[in-house]
A protein has these predicted regions:
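Long, charge-rich, low-complexity alpha-helical segments
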Residues: 1-72, 76-152, 213, 218-276
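A general structural signal for short secondary-structure junctions and capping/turn motifs
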Residues: 122, 153, 157-162, 195-198, ...
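Short, functional C-terminal segments
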Residues: 127, 133-188
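Low-complexity, glycine/alanine/valine/leucine- and proline-rich hydrophobic stretches
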Residues: 163-233
């Protein structure tokens, strides 16, 4: 069977599409050549309208993903900030639930938001909730199957837990859990709750999807959160506990088991995988 010749140059249709896409989110670029309006109007004007609609729709996606960030800074500030992010970081996937992963880190370096040092961590928490909604499901290990392991301290110390794919740990030097929780209330209750939040306290949380498909935010002590994060990396429980002596291993395990967040149990990882 005769093979078709290898292409020697980019097909003009994809090349035009690439130029069109690039110009949509780069206002310094002119509209791609060859555009025509069906009614004879100026293609550059119509392209500018379309460009604005695309940016506006992406800003709306970010507003839906980060509602508490938007409430904290106000609609106008958020709209301007999100527009800059969209122009700096256009989507790389057609799946809009994946868009905005870089916003928390970007906000941390966004100078106009420096008066709200907790804003980036609030964005991290909200992104973790979105990821929990869309993460793969996994069957939890039955509590009965873990009973023997829990009763054998030496085996327990060597065990590695595979945690549920929806689980994330968020640790912050700011009261991000309290701030996020206050914004889940009505306006009157929210303002009263916010007045009670100590803005210089550190907070941490586990974020995961529960059996009812809700993304929960469960506050826990920072040391316990650090231990949970170590367990999530596959570290043996004994080593994780040694690295975080202030944490309560029993309390962390109880929390993980109660919410069905242990998806597998294994022995210690090979040395080649644990060394760095």
């Amino acid at each position: 069977m005769t093979q078709p010749p290898a292409p020697t140059a980019m097909d003009p249709a994809p090349a035009t599409a690439l130029r069109f896409a690039a110009a949509l989110l780069d206002t310094s670029l002119p509209p791609p050549a060859g555009l025509h309006a069906w009614n004879g109007s100026d293609p550059a004007v119509r392209f500018a309208v379309y460009r604005n609609n695309v940016v506006h729709s992406l800003v709306a996606v970010l507003a839906d993903t980060f509602p508490v960030v938007r409430q904290l800074v106000g609609d106008d500030f958020f709209g301007a900030m999100a527009r800059l992010y969209v122009l700096d970081h256009p989507p790389r996937s057609p799946l809009m639930h994946r868009y905005g992963a870089g916003l928390p880190a970007w906000v941390a370096d966004f100078e106009p938001a420096t008066a709200l040092p907790y804003l980036s961590d609030i964005a991290r928490l909200e992104w973790a909730r979105l990821c929990a909604f869309h993460a793969a499901d996994a069957e939890p290990v039955p509590v009965q199957a873990l009973a023997a392991l829990i009763q054998a301290p030496q085996r327990l110390a060597r065990a590695c837990l595979e945690l549920h794919p929806t689980l994330a740990v968020v640790r912050s030097a700011h009261p991000v859990v309290s701030l996020w929780a206050a914004h889940q209330l009505s306006d009157a209750d929210r303002d009263a709750r916010l007045a009670e939040v100590p803005l210089h306290s550190a907070e941490a949380a586990l974020i995961f999807r529960d059996a009812s498909d809700d993304a929960l935010v469960v506050e826990l002590p920072d040391a316990d959160a650090a231990l949970a994060a170590a367990i999530a990396t596959g570290a043996p429980l004994g080593a994780a506990q040694t690295a975080h002596p202030e944490a309560d291993l029993a309390r962390v395990l109880s929390l993980l088991l109660r919410h069905g967040l242990v998806a597998g149990v294994g022995g210690p990882l090979p040395a080649t995988e644990t060394s760095a």
